[in-house]
């Protein structure tokens, strides 16, 4: 679970004008969000997490708390907006019950905190996992059919936030369902892909045309801030590019611009799965060689950002420039 504070939390508090609070601020997206909030000026943002941040953002009031139990947590002054990013999300990586304990109970506790503090706006990061695996294109209006504990827990968490919204006409809720989010500090799918290409080789497990919805982290934040400015009390949107990029297109964008010497091969899925089982211990080295992660590469996440597209807030052809931005900010290391 992401959520945070340095060992010696700041004692600063928001002023009477009110400021934002970020649950899960020590995580990947949370760290980028906090930088954005600090850069925008205004009241000092509060970050709440169980873990210390890997990268401390100057100007943030870091607090330590567990979103599964916020009954004794208090923030002095008015809170303008809650960003609920706290979650157990890595799959594989956790027993099933941990997804529910953190994601569902966390939603219950965060909305209860919002009631106590009379907060009228929440931004909640859900997941495209609520749609379940499918080769069909999914939009915000598609039926939900999660199959994983993570996806089911996020679906339940969405309903908890909706119940909070429905209690008062003065409240606002933005729910974003992010696809694969990449960028500095990600440490996930795209980082592993970059490591493999840097090592000189990427293997396609049985197919190259898997559609993988994705979004650069700063573009995700742009979309969230855009949604916050909408006049609607409730906004639900998919956080991804509209291009329906295939795995091969993503790999080639990496390879052409940053790893021109890397070679790619396509090997039957069964062979790759057998190799992943044998090399599974190497996942501890950060390469993520795990059978379940291999299967993710052959299952499409074909997601359309319909809400953003209908409002002309979704731009095509950005994967190359997004990778360039990541390379520039990480000195080409893609970390």
Enumerate the predicted regions with their spans:
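Amphipathic terminal alpha-helices
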Residues: 1-9, 303-335
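N-terminal Rossmann NAD(P)H-binding glycine-rich loop of SDR-like oxidoreductase domains
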Residues: 20-40
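NAD(P)H-binding glycine-rich loop region in Rossmannoid oxidoreductase-like domains
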Residues: 64-105, 109, 113, 131-133
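Conserved Rossmann-fold NAD(P)-dependent oxidoreductase catalytic core, especially the SDR/UDP-sugar
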Residues: 109-149, 169
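Flexible, glycine-rich beta-alpha linker
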Residues: 131-132, 174-192
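Active-site Tyr-X1-5-Lys
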Residues: 145-174
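Substrate-positioning beta->alpha
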Residues: 186-192, 206-228, 234-235
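Mid/C-terminal beta-alpha module of Rossmann-like enzyme folds, strongest
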Residues: 227-288, 317-335
């Amino acid at each position: 679970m992401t959520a945070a504070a340095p060992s010696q939390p700041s004692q600063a508090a928001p002023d009477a004008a009110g400021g934002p609070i970020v649950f899960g601020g020590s995580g990947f997206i949370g760290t980028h969000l906090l930088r954005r909030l600090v850069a925008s000026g205004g009241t000092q943002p509060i970050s709440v997490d169980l873990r210390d941040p890997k990268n401390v953002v100057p100007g943030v009031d870091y607090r330590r708390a567990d979103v599964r139990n916020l009954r004794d947590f208090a923030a002095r002054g008015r809170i303008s907006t809650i960003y609920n990013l706290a979650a157990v999300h890595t799959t594989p990586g956790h027993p099933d019950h941990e997804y529910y304990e953190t994601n569902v109970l966390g939603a219950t506790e965060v909305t209860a905190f919002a009631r106590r503090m009379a907060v009228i706006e929440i931004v909640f990061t859900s997941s495209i996992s609520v749609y379940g695996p499918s080769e069909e294109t999914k939009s915000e209006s598609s039926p939900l059919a999660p199959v994983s504990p993570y996806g089911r827990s996020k679906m339940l968490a969405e309903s908890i936030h909706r119940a909070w919204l429905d209690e008062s006409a003065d409240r606002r809720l933005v729910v974003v369902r992010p696809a694969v989010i990449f960028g500095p500090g990600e440490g996930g799918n795209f980082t592993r892909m970059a490591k493999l290409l840097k090592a000189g080789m990427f293997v396609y497990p049985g197919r190259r045309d898997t559609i993988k919805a994705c979004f650069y982290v700063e573009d995700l934040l742009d979309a969230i801030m855009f949604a916050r400015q909408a006049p609607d009390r409730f906004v639900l949107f998919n956080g991804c590019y509209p291009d329906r990029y295939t795995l091969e297109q993503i790999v080639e964008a990496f390879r052409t611009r940053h790893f021109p010497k890397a070679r790619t091969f396509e090997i039957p899925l069964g062979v790759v799965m057998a190799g992943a089982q044998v090399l599974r211990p190497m996942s501890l080295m950060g390469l993520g060689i795990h059978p379940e992660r291999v299967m993710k590469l052959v299952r499409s996440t074909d997601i359309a950002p319909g809400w953003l597209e209908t409002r002309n807030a979704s731009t095509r052809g950005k994967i190359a420039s997004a990778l360039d931005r990541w390379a520039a900010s990480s000195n080409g290391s893609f970390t």
